[in-house]
Amino acid sequence: MPLSGMAIAFKASTSACTAQQLWGHPTRDQCQYGFTHLNERKSRKGSAALHARAVSGKLDLDFSDPSWKQKYQEDWDRRFSLPHITDVFDLEPRLTTFSLKKNSDASSPDKWNGYVNKDDRALLKVINYASNTSAGAECIDPDCSWVEHWVHRAGPRKEIYYEPEEVKAAIVTCGGLCPGLNDVIRQIVFTLEIYGVKNIVGIQFGYRGFFEKGLKEMPLSRDVVENINLAGGSFLGVSRGGAKTSEIVDSIQARRIDMLFVIGGNGSHAGANAIHEECRKRKLKVSVVAVPKTIDNDILFMDKTFGFDTAVEEAQRAINSAYIEARSAYHGVGLVKLMGRSTGFIAMHASLSSGQIDVCLIPEVSFTLDGEHGVLSHLEHLLETKGFCVVCVAEGAGQDLLQKSNATDASGNVILSDFGVHMQQKIKKHFKDIGVLADVKYIDPTYMVRACRANASDAILCTVLGQNAVHGAFAGFSGITSGICNTHYAFLPITEVITTPKHVNPNSRMWHRCLTSTGQPDFH
C-alpha cells in the first residue's frame, strides 16, 4: 500500500468505532482509550442481553460469565504485547553498553544506570468509576467494573539485541511541522552515541528522502545536532505522502539500515507499521520505532503529544490579540481559528487557559449557527450585555454546515472547508441583517503555532521520548511507539495506537470545565 494512502486507510478504520456508543454515553469519544464498547439487545421477553466486542480483535464477552474479566485482561495483554525481533530471529541478548557511570573502574548498583525490568508495567487507567453516569466514565460493563489495563514501561534494559558498533541508525521526520522535532532528533542522536553507535544518518524530507533522487543521507553526530533545538521546524525537513512501502523497504535494505526512527502523527505511524511488517516479511533485522508527533494531541492512549503545550501557549497570543481588538471596538467580535482537523484539544485548552473566550466550537460537539438557540443569537446576547465577545473555533468544527469536498492532500487527508472564514462572513451578515453594527476581527495563527521552538514542557517531553525510542530499539522491539500514559513513559504497539484517533469527550470533566469558563449554552 502506498504510504500516501495510509491516512485514508487509517481514517476509514475509525468510522465503525465512532459510530458506536459506550454504555449510556452516546459521544464521539467512545474510542479514546480503546476499551470495549457495549451494545444492549432486547430479547423476545424484553429483557436485556448484554454483549461486548473489543475495539480491536474478535473478543466477545458475556458478563454473566464469572471469568469475563480474566478473558478481557488476557485479550488486552495479547493486544498490547510488543513485537520483538526474536519473534523472527533466534537471537541471544548481550549486556547493554548503555551506562551513566563516568568512571569505568567504579562499581555501582544497576539502579544507578536507570535500567528498567522487562516485566515492569504502567497502569493506563486510574479512575475507578462507580457508575456509568459519572462524568467521562469509560465502562466495559454496565456496572463499570474495575479492570486493570497495563502497558509496558519504557526505559533502558540491562540486555540488548544489537551490537552498537555495527548499527546504522536512521531518523526521519514526517508530516507537518511541530514544535519539538529538533529536540527529539537531538536526543535520539545523543542516546545512540551513548550506546556506542557511530553510523547515524538523517533521511531528508520525510519518507520522500528514501526514494527521491538528489536527497542524500545527512550524517548526524552530537556535534552536528548540538544546537538544533534552539530553533523551530525540522533540521531534516518534512513532507507528506511518500512512495510504496516496498520501495521504502528496498531503500532501507540497500542502505543497510538496522534501526529506523519515525517521528510523525497517525498517518506516519501507520506508515511506520507498514514498514515494520514488510521488514518482517523479508526477514530483515530492522527495528522500526516511532515517536508520536502532532500538535492536535489526537494520538490514542497518550496523555499528550509533544508540541501540544507549545501550540496552546502560542494560540493564547492570538486569543489575547483578538480579545484586545474586540474589547477596544464598539460591538467588537474577536474570532480565532485554531488547528484541529478532527479534534478540539487545542481550542479547548487554549480557551481554558486564556480565560478570554465566550464561545468555543470544536469538531466533537455539534452546533447550529442560526435560530433562537444558535451561536449567532448568543453573540447578539453577548454584545447586548457585555458589549463585545471572543469566539474560538477549531478548524474542523462545523464541517457539517459547509459544502463537503472529496479532495485530499498528499497524506490522504480530506481538505476541509474553511469554517473560520465562513463563520466570519456569517457573523457579519447576521448583524447587518438585523441592523446592528458589529466590528469583526478574524485571526488565523495556524502556521505560527506549529513553526516555533518548543517550550520548556514540550522540550522535556521530547527529550524523554527521544531517549526511550532508542532504548526500545536496542531492547529489540519493533513496530512500537514511545509515549506518556497516565504520567508514565511507556512503549505501545503501533497497531493499537492507530486503531482510531483520540477525541475530546463531550462528557468529560475537561470539556465541562471549558463550558464553565466560557458560560456558553448548548447551541441546538
Model feature map: region roles:
Residues 251, 262-264, 270-289, 300-438:
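Accessory alpha-helical/coil subdomains and C-terminal extensions
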Residues 335-342, 395, 444-447, 483-491:
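A glycine-rich phosphate-binding loop feature that marks nucleotide/adenosyl-phosphate handling sites
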Residues 403-408, 450-460, 492-500:
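Short glycine/threonine-rich loop-to-helix capping motif typified by GTGT followed
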Residues 166-170, 389, 439:
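Residues that mark the start of a beta-strand
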Residues 437-452:
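Active-site pocket-lining segment
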